[in-house]
Each structure stands twice: as C-alpha cells, then as structure tokens.
Amino acid sequence: MPLAQLADPWQKMAVESPSDSAENGQQIMDEPMGEEEINPQTEEGSIKEIAITHHVKEGHEKADPSQFELLKVLGQGSFGKVFLVKKISGSDARQLYAMKVLKKATLKVRDRVRTKMERDILVEVNHPFIVKLHYAFQTEGKLYLILDFLRGGDLFTRLSKEVMFTEEDVKFYLAELALALDHLHSLGIIYRDLKPENILLDEEGHIKLTDFGLSKESIDHEKKAYSFCGTVEYMAPEVVNRRGHTQSADWWSFGVLMFEMLTGTLPFQGKDRKETMTMILKAKLGMPQFLSPEAQSLLRMLFKRNPANRLGAGPDGVEEIKRHSFFSTIDWNKLYRREIHPPFKPATGRPEDTFYFDPEFTAKTPKDSPGIPPSANAHQLFRGFSFVAITSDDESQAMQTVGVHSIVQQLHRNSIQFTDGYEVKEDIGVGSYSVCKRCIHKATNMEFAVKIIDKSKRDPTEEIEILLRYGQHPNIITLKDVYDDGKYVYVVTELMKGGELLDKILRQKFFSEREASAVLFTITKTVEYLHAQGVVHRDLKPSNILYVDESGNPESIRICDFGFAKQLRAENGLLMTPCYTANFVAPEVLKRQGYDAACDIWSLGVLLYTMLTGYTPFANGPDDTPEEILARIGSGKFSLSGGYWNSVSDTAKDLVSKMLHVDPHQRLTAALVLRHPWIVHWDQLPQYQLNRQDAPHLVKGAMAATYSALNRNQSPVLEPVGRSTLAQRRGIKKITSTAL
C-alpha cells in the first residue's frame, strides 16, 4: 500500500518572458477574447485608480489597519500577503480573521478590476459554504479585505494527503459545493476557478468556497463571458475554445473535481498546456471501473462537451444535479443547515494555531510591507497550504519547515540523508525489524525519537500512512519527519519523555480507581476514534502507550508504534470507514476487521486489570511458557475475587470481565466501554489507594511474556510499495493558480 501523496504543491517557478510564458506555462492568465470586462481603450501606461469603497461588518464600526494585530503570515505572493490577524478594538475585539493585503502599486489595471470584483462579490454573497467578507478598506497605497479565518486549510491539502477519498466523502463535499455554486449562479456570477485549492475547510470540516479573483459578474446579453482564465486542467471545453461560456462551465469543473477526488488523478492532463487543452476538447475519457454506477453516471452527465447538454445547464439548474442518484442519500435541507457531520474534522487546538498552513509562511515575522520577490508570478499570490504535523509547542515552529520538506522529498530518493539533519543518540528500544533511538535536530537542538526500519524485513508504508492521517489527534504520537535511503526508513516522531504508562502507574505510590478511570477513558477515546476511521492498532500492549512528558496527566498519554496497525480498505485499494463499507468490502475482510478491533479492546482490558491489581491476568511472570499463557487466554478464565481484588469496586470488575470476554463477538466495543458506568460516573469512584502488588519488574516481565506468546506467529509478508495498484495509479501533478 502506498505512502500518501506528499509532493510539494508549490514548486518554485522561474520567471519567463511574456512570449515563453504564453507558450509553455500551464497557468492561463485572463486574455481578452471578444467582449471583455476591461475597457479596451485602457492601456497600462494610463492606469486609472479603481475606487474601492469601505465595507463595514454589520453592527460594527468602520475599520482600518490599526485595529488589527498581525499574528502570522498565512500566504504570500508577488502582489501582497495574507495574514492571520486579531481585532484589537471594537465590539468584535479578540476575533481572529484572515487579512488579505494588496499593494496598489504592483497591480495592473486588470488585477485592480479583479480585486474590485472580488470585493463586490463577497459583499453581495452570504452563504454557509462561501467565505464571508467582514471588512473592506483601503489606504493610500494598499487594499484590505478582512475575511473568515478558516483553520482547516484547503481541500487540496487533504486530497494530497489521502490520495483519494471514499465516495461518501466525495458526496458530502460535492453536495455542499453544489449549494455554494448554485447561490453564486443565482446572483449572476460564474465562478470559473473551481479546484481543490480554492475550497477551504472550517474548524468543523464544512467547506467554504473562496478566491473570487477570476469570477465573472459582467456578462453579455446572451449571458456569456469570453475571458480565457483559470487553471487549464479544470477548464470546460467552451472556455478552452473561447466561444463564450456560461455558468454551465462551472459544472464541467465540478466534474473534474469529482473525478480527481474519487481517483487521485485529473481526467485531462497532458505533458504541457497545449496537449491538455487538446485532451479537454477531443480525448475520450475512460471511466474507472472501481467507481460505483451512480458515480460513473454523474461524471458522464457532467462531462458533456456541448454545454447545453450538461447536467445543471437545463432550466432546473442545480436541481438536476441534486436529483441525480449519486446524491440520493443527501438530505439537502439538513445539509444547508450544516446538520450533517463532515467526514473529516480538522484537529483543534488554540484558536490561533495554523496546523494546516504552510510553515514556509507561518514561520515568518508578520509585517504589513509586502514586497515583490524576484521570481514571483501573478498567480502565486495566494499559494495554498500543505500538511504540517500538529504540535502545541511554540518552539516547534522552527522545526516544522524542515519536517515538511523532508516528508515531501522522501519518495524521490533525494540526496538528503537523515544524518544531515539529525544527530543520533542512544537506543530507546530494539525490535525484530526496527530500532528506536533518541536523536537531536541539528538546526534547532530539539530532541526527537527516530524509528529506523529495515525495509527488507517490513514495509513501513501502512504505519507512515496512518501517522500522516491521524497523527494530529492529541493522544496519537506525532510524526515529524520521514527519510528513505533505499535500505532503511527513518520515521522521526516526538520524544516520549515521560516513559511507559504502566511503568509510571506501577511506581506511583498512590493510585485510585478514579485515576485509573481517567487513564482508560483517554486511551479508549483514542481507540474509538481510530476504529471509527477504519483503523485497528493490533498491538496495544502497555509498552506502546507512553507519556509525552513527566506530568503524568491523562492528556499527555500517546498511543505509539503503529507497525502492526491496519486500515480498512475495499478490494480496489480505496480506504474505507466502517459506516460506508457494506457495498465495497468483502465480508471476510469486515469480519477480520471486527476481530482486530475486539483484540484492541482485549489489550485495554489487560491494561485495566493490571492497573487495578498490580499483576497481569494470564501470566505470573517472565518465565511462563507461551503454551501456558495461550492456554489461559484461550480458556477465558481469570480471577476477579480475593486478594488485591478486595479493594476494587464491583463496577470496575464488571468492566474488566466484559473487556476480557473470551468471545470477541461478545466483547465490548470502544464506544460501549466509554458508556460503561465505571467510565461515565468517574466522579463517584473511590479515591482511596488501591491495594496492588508492588513488583513492577515482575509485572513488566509477565506482560512482555503475554504479548510475546500472542505475537510469536505473526509474520506478515508485504510486497514493495511500488507494486500496489494505488501506488502505480497515484501521480497527481500539482496545479497552481493564476487567481489573485
């Protein structure tokens, strides 16, 4: 199974002469063809000032730059910057916004018209799935747009990380997008630049359409526009051939986006702009057979080269799309009211955190003095966002840029070596196929852990993929870097300075049931999150549950070592989640997944048993043979009475027995564990000292013997990453934008 797509979406582009750019560039700048929104009499040498009136947030006073504190840079290009700002005065003081700043001196007349148009469109638009403009104002030299700050980054980043989405994910995003486009169309606006980079995610995971620099309000009497603009791969045929286009062009781009999200590739993409345009006009599109009949049908109806025949172009407009069988399960009223839960919720932290924004920008000191970099092109103004590992430490900002770039480059076998950036220290742990060491990042002197995996013994793809997807969870170890030198893979993570959870608990002089409940709640909540995403850990032994610091607080617990973890996949390689699997996953795969999830709960039951009593349920010490241990486990018999159990409550014993049930089908799920009275009513649990066996070394040996017996027959054989269908099919070429 392949590593997630990690190529850098923002490749630096060399400055080209106008003639070269027109011939070779993939990006299409607005070129007047036929009727155009710009007065043909206007020349660059006689630029006229565009009057941008102030816009004030309803119920608030007029704004100016002095009312906003600059916190971070979110994006930067040749014409200006986007800042994360905090309002420091007025009735909305302390509110966070994104502030788009443009220098008038660097804007040509066409760019000024676009900026004015973007401002006017945003003032007019009020929709739950379209970014909101709160203020617009200008100074003598600059233009300012104050917009929603959307913490979740853009859809392009998530697509790059996931490779492709499930059909249920795509259905959700497309449905919200359809409502947003329909609202724009109802106002006479053609969006014209639909692509993942321009679809942002708010903190709940709902979409927000943004960047209206290429949108078109002024159209002729036939309701057609003639500008040749946007990103070529997403252009409709009528835009490419310059015969005039209507709002129907947005529905073609809607189809391109759908195809890309479902397959991980673009439907029409040649080696250069000219070939791509030819494919859009003439190429026959092969429909991937792993797509459902409903998805294939919708794509065929969107990819009609005659715009009049395209779904959504008829008199009913978006209703044609909403009635299509692909969206049959969507409740459109609930969707509009934001009552349907998104498939992905961005990690939450402090309000000003910028986990999903490019550290190339966020690491810069924010100054409201945008310059013109020598190699900047017009379309680079609002470059998007790339995956950044979640972290709550301010000091980690210096580390993030290095981490992201090394992850980006590791698939390309570049010349960068792990030891170029890190100094290797002592061993932390040694396994059968890997060794874990402490390491120090040379540039920042920060400590990390590195897991060095021998690729000849184990394919680390699944482990890295899971950490990339779910490492933003506060109780899952955070991935910082990945290097691949061909023989070994170096997985750099945060350092677990607090040590193993069980070690700390067993050495703790005072430990109560209430404390044990808090620990189990944190771990089980994390496991429930993984299981809901179709991920099973399969090796939840206590040595893989550690503290990130010395505090001992449940919040500092991290689940580590996903070397045996698995993600639920359909037969075609698509990642799935349990609620969407009925039509895509073989029953035996689901059965195995359910068994593995039950094994995770069993492991947590062993941990709970040991926390409460100070000894393990199935092994007496490190000298027990595997046969003896497996026989006890298979019998399902363990003691819950007498001795150390006399100080344990009946509700705790009930939970232990249900988590360690010998029949995996009768074992509690993670969700049911969280609903058990011992977890729910934690504040009513005893706070007195548990009477436990005081022999931590003996317990640790017994625990190691237990999991050694369980894992001794596990020897999975995995083929190299490159042989997987998904890896061969993946090859997304990153698209940049000409939009302001």
UniProtKB/Swiss-Prot annotation:
Subunit structure: Forms a complex with either MAPK1/ERK2 or MAPK3/ERK1 in quiescent cells. Transiently dissociates following mitogenic stimulation. Interacts with NFATC4, ETV1/ER81 and FGFR1.
One annotated GO biological process: intracellular signal transduction
Gene: Rps6ka3
Activity regulation remarks: Upon extracellular signal or mitogen stimulation, phosphorylated at Thr-577 in the C-terminal kinase domain (CTKD) by MAPK1/ERK2 and MAPK3/ERK1. The activated CTKD then autophosphorylates Ser-386, allowing binding of PDPK1, which in turn phosphorylates Ser-227 in the N-terminal kinase domain (NTDK) leading to the full activation of the protein and subsequent phosphorylation of the substrates by the NTKD.
Residue sites binding ATP per the record: 74-82, 100, 428-436, 451
Keyword Ubl conjugation among UniProt keywords: no
Residue span, Protein kinase domain: 68-327, 422-679
Protein role: Serine/threonine-protein kinase that acts downstream of ERK (MAPK1/ERK2 and MAPK3/ERK1) signaling and mediates mitogenic and stress-induced activation of the transcription factors CREB1, ETV1/ER81 and NR4A1/NUR77, regulates translation through RPS6 and EIF4B phosphorylation, and mediates cellular proliferation, survival, and differentiation by modulating mTOR signaling and repressing pro-apoptotic function of BAD and DAPK1.
PTMs per UniProt: Activated by phosphorylation at Ser-227 by PDPK1. Autophosphorylated on Ser-386, as part of the activation process. May be phosphorylated at Thr-365 and Ser-369 by MAPK1/ERK2 and MAPK3/ERK1. Can also be activated via phosphorylation at Ser-386 by MAPKAPK2. N-terminal myristoylation results in an activated kinase in the absence of added growth factors.
Catalytic activity from the UniProt record: L-seryl-[protein] + ATP = O-phospho-L-seryl-[protein] + ADP + H(+); L-threonyl-[protein] + ATP = O-phospho-L-threonyl-[protein] + ADP + H(+)
Cofactor(s) annotated in UniProt: Mg(2+)
Annotated positions of the Phosphothreonine modification: 365
A Pfam family that the UniProt record links to this protein: Pkinase
Residues with the Phosphoserine modification: 227, 369, 375, 386, 415, 556, 715
This protein's record includes keyword ATP-binding: yes
Record family assignment: Belongs to the protein kinase superfamily. AGC Ser/Thr protein kinase family. S6 kinase subfamily.
Tissue-specificity statement: Intestine, thymus, lung, heart and brain.
InterPro entries named among the record's database cross-references: AGC-kinase_C (IPR000961), Kinase-like_dom_sf (IPR011009), Pkinase_C (IPR017892), Prot_kinase_dom (IPR000719), Protein_kinase_ATP_BS (IPR017441), Ribosomal_S6_kinase_II (IPR016239), RPS6KA3_C (IPR041905), RSK_N (IPR041906)
Superkingdom as given in the UniProt entry: Eukaryota
UniProt GO molecular function: ATP binding; magnesium ion binding; protein kinase binding; protein serine kinase activity; protein serine/threonine kinase activity
GO cellular component: cytosol; nucleolus; nucleoplasm
Lineage of producing organism: Eukaryota, Metazoa, Chordata, Craniata, Vertebrata
In-chain residues carrying the UniProt-annotated modification Phosphotyrosine: 529
Protein name: Ribosomal protein S6 kinase alpha-3
Entry-linked SUPFAM superfamilies: Protein kinase-like (PK-like)
Keywords, alphabetical: ATP-binding, Cell cycle, Cytoplasm, Kinase, Nucleotide-binding, Nucleus, Phosphoprotein, Repeat, Serine/threonine-protein kinase, Stress response, Transferase
The enzyme's E.C. designation: 2.7.11.1
Effect of disrupting the coding gene: Mice were born at expected Mendelian ratio but display decreased bone mass. Embryos and pups show a delay in mineralization of the skull with frontal, parietal, and interparietal bones of reduced size. Mice also display a significant reduction in long bone length at one month of age.
